[in-house]
Amino acid sequence: ELIGAANRDTKSFSINRKDAKERVAKAAR
């Protein structure tokens, strides 16, 4: 159960980082 929650957090964290990178790239343009 703990591992499942950690995996979910890691997945959403990497998704958030990807979104942030795309936002930064758009802002830089």
UniProtKB/Swiss-Prot annotation:
User: Where along the chain is composition biased (Basic and acidic residues)?
Assistant: 8-29
Positions of region (Disordered): 1-29
Task: Tell me where on the tree of life, at the top rank, the source sits.
Answer: Archaea
Is the keyword Ribonucleoprotein in the record?
A: yes
Q: Which GO terms describe its cellular component?
A: ribonucleoprotein complex; ribosome
- Keywords linked to the UniProt accession: Ribonucleoprotein, Ribosomal protein, RNA-binding, rRNA-binding
Functionally, this protein is described as follows: One of the primary rRNA binding proteins, it binds directly to 16S rRNA where it nucleates assembly of the head domain of the 30S subunit. Is located at the subunit interface close to the decoding center.
Identify this protein by name: Small ribosomal subunit protein uS7
Q: Give the species this sequence originates from.
A: Methanosarcina thermophila
Its taxonomic path starts at: Archaea, Methanobacteriati, Methanobacteriota, Stenosarchaea group, Methanomicrobia
